[in-house]
Amino acid sequence: MVKEQFRETDVAKKISHICFGMKSAEEMRQQAHIQVVSKNLYSQDNNHSPLLYGVLDHRMGTSEKDRPCETCGKNLADCLGHYGYIDLELPCFHVGYFRAVIGILQMICKTCCHIMLSQEEKKQFLDYLKRPGLTYLQKRGLKKKISDKCRKKNTCHHCGAFNGTVKKCGLLKIIHEKYKTNKKVVDPIVSSFLQSFETAIEHNKEVEPLLGKAQENLNPLVVLNLFKRIPAEDIPLLLMNPEAGKPSDLILTRLLVPPLCIRPSVVSDLKSGTNEDDLTMKLTEIIFLNDVIKKHRISGAKTQMIMEDWDFLQLQCALYINSELSGIPLNMAPKKWTRGFVQRLKGKQGRFRGNLSGKRVDFSGRTVISPDPNLRIDEVAVPVHVAKILTFPEKVNKANINFLRKLVRNGPEVHPGANFIQQRHTQMKRFLKYGNREKMAQELKFGDIVERHLIDGDVVLFNRQPSLHKLSIMAHLARVKPHRTFRFNECVCTPYNADFDGDEMNLHLPQTEEAKAEALVLMGTKANLVTPRNGEPLIAAIQDFLTGAYLLTLKDTFFDRAKACQIIASILVGKDEKIKVRLPPPTILKPVTLWTGKQIFSVILRPSDDNPVRANLRTKGKQYCGRGEDLCVNDSYVTIQNSELMSGSMDKGTLGSGSKNNIFYILLRDWGQNEAADAMSRLARLAPVYLSNRGFSIGIGDVTPGQGLLKAKYELLNAGYKKCDEYIEALNTGKLQQQPGCTAEETLEALILKELSVIRDHAGSACLRELDKSNSPLTMALCGSKGSFINISQMIACVGQQAISGSRVPDGFENRSLPHFEKHSKLPAAKGFVANSFYSGLTPTEFFFHTMAGREGLVDTAVKTAETGYMQRRLVKSLEDLCSQYDLTVRSSTGDIIQFIYGGDGLDPAAMEGKDEPLEFKRVLDNIKAVFPCRSEPALSKNELLLSAESIMKKNEFLCCQDSFLQEIKKFIKEVSEKIKKTRDKYGINDNGTTEPRVLYQLDRITPTQIEKFLETCRDKYMRAQMEPGSAVGALCAQSIGEPGTQMTLKTFHFAGVASMNITLGVPRIKEIINASKAISTPIITAQLDKDDDADYARLVKGRIEKTLLGEISEYIEEVFLPDDCFILVKLSLERIRLLRLEVNAETVRYSICMSKLRVKPGDVAVHGEAVVCVTPRENSKSSMYYVLQFLKEDLPKVVVQGIPEVSRAVIHIDEQSGKEKYKLLVEGDNLRAVMATHGVKGTRTTSNNTYEVEKTLGIEAARTTIINEIQYTMVNHGMSIDRRHVMLLSDLMTYKGEVLGITRFGLAKMKESVLMLASFEKTADHLFDAAYFGQKDSVCGVSECIIMGIPMNIGTGLFKLLHKANRDPSPPRRPLIFDTNEFHIPLVT
């Protein structure tokens, strides 16, 4: 079946809200067109037609193209379908409402059907229910409250009857424990029931214990009668909406039969028969069972038979709705799995996620991608084959009629052509493959629509899955080219995360002019050069472009005139074709004129004199030697002055993505997106041309080690092995000094791992010294285009230590890693050290270890992809409808305020030039000074500068800037003025003195024009950095946190410097934080000390915090048996207590023993001297003295004598800042409150990484800060930087309700009201049935709901309701009236 767009009428209507509810039996009958009674599908005559009153009756719609519906007469595409109904012989439970039915039964009296509350309580709850703004969440909470209150009562307030507990028993059965009585309360009904068994008990004693277990079976018939008798005034207390359904509607007495179009019969040609839908078959089974029960009732069969049939009918009705029921008895289990209604809705392929939230679309194409550096970065090459199929509906008007006529004449086979014409007044489309195209072209009129082929310059959307962030789908301009692949400039690989090893990408063609405009402005490649994650450029030069630019800008690259002109000519194409390039003056004049590569690179930035771009940049390169700035020996300090490269060779830092010192980023920020994109396109053409002419390749010769290198490598290996042997020897002789918190074995492992890891690094640096600078792998590593020094060192010198989960290869079987080695061997080779290089080849054991490490990486990647994908989906679902409003707040779709001002300052993370800051003042000032030298103006002194800046900033233009931003500017200007004063004082220039101007010009000088321009630029950039109202800040936040997650690892890392203090990082840690887990895997409390420079004091406090058990400080704990007494003797080790700095003595131990859960009274514990404690057990009736003594002996060592029981251990951490050692405690455990209250700990500076613990101790704001800090800490540890505004938004969303809500299905249900949104996330059926029970109304305002309903969402361009069109005539023109003409003006005769 083709999915058609559903339009009932031609009048535009908008869905304002959706009400959920339950249909009563009467409403079902009114909705249905026929009653279905026949269990047979087809009549037995020859033509095999559907049976009347059967499940396939054609009055319920049609599922065949050639048969019209018998009710409305429409065909398959237009008929919506009509319902039928089946009357059930006996009522059944509705599986979706089963929990609700039990809930109601627990709330009402099973005798009089009133709700089990007193009149006062009823009144109190009813008053609360009358509140107008009662939300869905409050309703659900209230129902739980009322239910809890009712379940505590067992006597009805209305009739005084006794009510037992109601619970589920078996499959779809409910029992009422009516006769399970408490001795105190004896209900007359219960007592008469018990009395009726008295004679039976006398004859058979076994009956008595079973009496209390007697239960009343509440079958659907009983329940239905109870529900019908519930008084109308009590129904609101069940939280049901009387308009949406009554309690009796929860029980099925009638089933609706859905229309045929949703359960079509498929006629198979192979065998003469049809394939019926699961629903159809299930309905026939239900009708069959109905008939069986009817026959049995009429013929008077045994009750047990009817009950069994009833159970089976009940099961079939349940499977019809939800076929994944658990707990079906084996004799009733269905033979084959079928799809019920719930299965059609739930899951990724269900209606909600598969057909409503996301669909397959027309006007799209997909094929393999290839690189093409000759395209501009905003272009994509589309194959002719695709261009002929994708069409755009263009309206005929005066300007394009001739062009469109030409296309119509070309027809569908020739490109550019057209496929269809739709004439203005008819709805019919005419296919241009057939018919007289010349005639059709001549008949084209204004207003007709021509579906023309895709042509050059069309806006298309280009996308690669997985779409992890908004830059995974961008708008490009199409260029129709031959061949069969999509091609685009390699600069755009990074945002798509694409490579050309067989990746495929999708292309969509927008179908309206508005869509094209919106795509170009909001999704255009040029508009998305930077990532919203932190404002770093993503679209930038990669791989070959970097290598080419690096080699081009080396110090020793020279060209003669012909070569220089030839290379520069490669940029003269497309829109740059006509520009006049000014060849700069040659650098070397004699003996031959030569130009440098740096000059040619400058042409890329500013090709002609009439180009206004004057970019300025000063930054360190990748190999900067650390001093001398532009006099760096490696020529790696890049200086660009007014678009001329003065020094430095370009590398990944200055051309590639991920750095804000990138030249394209400077162009984008100072000169706009078009200039940056043009420069990138010029580089993408010039670099490959230069590189292919020069030649650049890699071969085995590049990775062959020389003799010197091999010798150095063996020396390194021997030294390293020798050191390892010394460590192993020290362990064996017991001389190895243990690291704090580690066993001797762990210490040895850590030392050897450290020693062996260094070998590879040293071998790598030996490689670099040895290799020629023209070596290809070295060049690539130096300019950052591919690979690193470690890769080179692994290829040439030594592969190094293989680590598995951060440690050496573990022993597998029989205490060795492989059978090639001795048992318990600790040698480097036996534990995964690979001494060979890839060039020399690996031995079998080395190869095995290397594959172990590689496999770990692969498994990690596979697991991580699924984990992060689900995490991203949860984040997007919870954050999607957050949007910045016109009053600068961030609100959800229901109007809840999440933040009063986005990120605290309302600035856009994508527009940040510094780290989380809108501007980098120094760079702006340097740029202003270069562009406006103002040589003739006098320089300002310190005071003049401050006064001048102050007066400019008092102007009205600066009122729109935040105070904090103005303070930042003032602070910067003050620093600059101080620097100027210092320089002037140094050279003895006073403020009013005169000096030779040329000397003054060389010094730091700022003129009035410069300071004015500087402040103007700052203000301008600040205003541009404002977050625009309507931005989907929530979705951006979700993507900015989810997308780096895919690049993280799943591992647990060690704390730097502290052995074995494990801390979870990576994806599991992010998952813990956003799930708001109460028990996290590694809770760590960081405690600052009152005296942080005293190691002894730190040990003392550590003793107070760390849990110390009696067994750890006792020399022995023994039983003592005397003739008349027995007790346990505990001897304390005073030496150990003294060494550990514990504040423990015999008295405190006695107190601890009494306070523990050992049930020992203070009189039973005696203290003898300083170190002896006697514990005398008490005999009890249950066990003998001997056993009590044994229990005591076993449990006494576990008594906590000092410290916090939840803290397993504490480690002293040493910070070496500014030469001073600072001590703090890292506490493993969860009791933050107790740690903060410990004497010696600075409570105000103590933090925990457990959000729940912080919220419990310090409140919600502290929890919010913890979430921010923990996410940022985890990201920084993995080398990711995320703008703090994103993390702030996430933490605000998690905490804005006053409790920490996780981004899980439970947290989401507490944040969001919308049923559709929750149903489209998880637990689809549960949410829909709940909504029907409560009679919930969904106001369709969030993003998910709007997409499901096909309504524009109120985010972005959908935020405002009225678009003000400017420059219109203020007053409408006066139209001539009918009586204005002169003939009506009869002169009056006086």
Curated annotation (Swiss-Prot):
Record GO biological process: defense response to virus; DNA-templated transcription; innate immune response; positive regulation of interferon-beta production
Domain of life: Eukaryota
Binding site for DNA template strand: 326, 348, 353, 360, 366, 1305, 1323
Keywords: Acetylation, Antiviral defense, Cytoplasm, DNA-directed RNA polymerase, Immunity, Innate immunity, Magnesium, Metal-binding, Nucleotidyltransferase, Nucleus, Transcription, Transferase, Zinc
Residues that bind DNA nontemplate strand: 144, 167, 1159
UniProt binding sites for Mg(2+) 1: 499, 501, 503
Pfam family, one: RNA_pol_Rpb1_5
Co-factor remark: Two Mg(2+) ions are coordinated by both the catalytic residues and the nucleic acid substrate to enhance substrate recognition and catalytic efficiency.
Residues that hold Zn(2+) 2 according to the record: 109, 112, 156, 159
Cytoplasm found in the keyword field: yes
Chain intervals for the UniProt region annotation (Bridging helix): 844-856
Catalysed reaction, written as an equation: RNA(n) + a ribonucleoside 5'-triphosphate = RNA(n+1) + diphosphate
Residues annotated as binding RNA: 464, 503
Signal peptide: none
Gene Ontology cellular component terms for the protein in this record: cytosol; mitochondrion; nuclear lumen; nucleus; RNA polymerase III complex
UniProt similarity note: Belongs to the RNA polymerase beta' chain family.
Biological role stated in the UniProt entry: Catalytic core component of RNA polymerase III (Pol III), a DNA-dependent RNA polymerase which synthesizes small non-coding RNAs using the four ribonucleoside triphosphates as substrates. Synthesizes 5S rRNA, snRNAs, tRNAs and miRNAs from at least 500 distinct genomic loci. Pol III-mediated transcription cycle proceeds through transcription initiation, transcription elongation and transcription termination stages. During transcription initiation, Pol III is recruited to DNA promoters type I, II or III with the help of general transcription factors and other specific initiation factors.
Assembly description: Component of the RNA polymerase III (Pol III) complex consisting of 17 subunits: a ten-subunit catalytic core composed of POLR3A/RPC1, POLR3B/RPC2, POLR1C/RPAC1, POLR1D/RPAC2, POLR3K/RPC10, POLR2E/RPABC1, POLR2F/RPABC2, POLR2H/RPABC3, POLR2K/RPABC4 and POLR2L/RPABC5; a mobile stalk composed of two subunits POLR3H/RPC8 and CRCP/RPC9, protruding from the core and functioning primarily in transcription initiation; and additional subunits homologous to general transcription factors of the RNA polymerase II machinery, POLR3C/RPC3-POLR3F/RPC6-POLR3G/RPC7 heterotrimer required for transcription initiation and POLR3D/RPC4-POLR3E/RPC5 heterodimer involved in both transcription initiation and termination.
Protein name: DNA-directed RNA polymerase III subunit RPC1
